Amino acid sequence: MRLHWSNAPCICYRISFLDIVLNESNLESLREEIDQIDSEIVKLLNLRVSKACDIGKIKQLKGVDPYDPAREEQVFTKLSSYSDGPLRKGSLRAVYREIISASIALEKDIVIGFLGPEATYTHQAAVKNFGSGLEYMALPDIPDVFSAVESGHCDYGVVPIENSTEGAVNRSLDLLVDSELTIIAQVFLRVRHCLFSQSSLDAISEVRSKDQALAQCADWLRVKLPGVSLVPVSSTAEAVRECKIHKGVAAIAGELAGQIYEVPMIESGIQDRSDNVTRFLVVAKQALPMRSETSYRTSLVLSLKDEVGALQNALKPFSERGINLCKIESRPSKRKSWDYFFFVDFAGHPEEEIVGDALKELGNACAFSRLLGSYPETGN
């Protein structure tokens, strides 16, 4: 056997037994410090929850619900200003989301309805907004969410309203027109679609999902699965449940749905755009009081008079006062042919003087107008 010697320099690391002992000692010392810190954190958390429950009792006497999204936004903003790192602001927000959720759960039994089944994007948005400490009710369709809140079976409902690539969720818009519910919060959720199936990619003949999800993956489907049948169903999670029992069927949904229903993931990140975000609304029976330190967005619906310049006249009260219109969208009213509702979002709250004046003038310029709700601009 020949031995070959290299001229390359050799770097040797010498770790003595003493070094190992010192490192182990330091490790144990750090763990003891963390244990002590955890002990203090738990004491402070219980103290915080006790104070929150005291506030809850005062709210109960006043007939005010413990959930207050505007106040929560103030808390999250203050927390961000307190922290210099290394904890990220998003992580800090997530931690306190659960702390606040646990506090609310001790103050009152609250039920949140959402478009089910479990693991839909709407479910994820609801948990992002309310935390995991509250009770959730999965409902089969968007109208059922509205009905559950209207009947009192749920305290709040979470529904999708628009997507950054596919636009409005028309079912939600239509229901907002006739419902007495009001919007009290908004939630933004980044959407990452995955393909699930019990079959291999080349054996798939049908893809099921929510209609919006199918549209958001149209380019990928056209290239990777040309000619397959695209079948819309009530939700992304329902599609995963169905593909589990049907051979040759695939589903488009979020990663969580595949994990919960135990269906293999074939492809991930199949949405046509990486910046795919869905906006959700939280609806309730009663509006929440305005907080002066909070920036608000307000939603309303209107229909125009049948006259020249009707739309310009309707929007004039906002432009004259420098009120920013965040969104305007038309939708057939379904009351008569070629009659449209216009859904408008603007920056501000009706209790602000200039907004109140604009709304009074708007009422005279329109055939019909109704406020749908005011809510914190920031949102989750």
Report residues per predicted region.
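Domain-level signature for soluble enzymes in the chorismate/prephenate branch of the shikimate pathway
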Residues: 17-380
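Cysteine-centered motifs
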Residues: 10-12
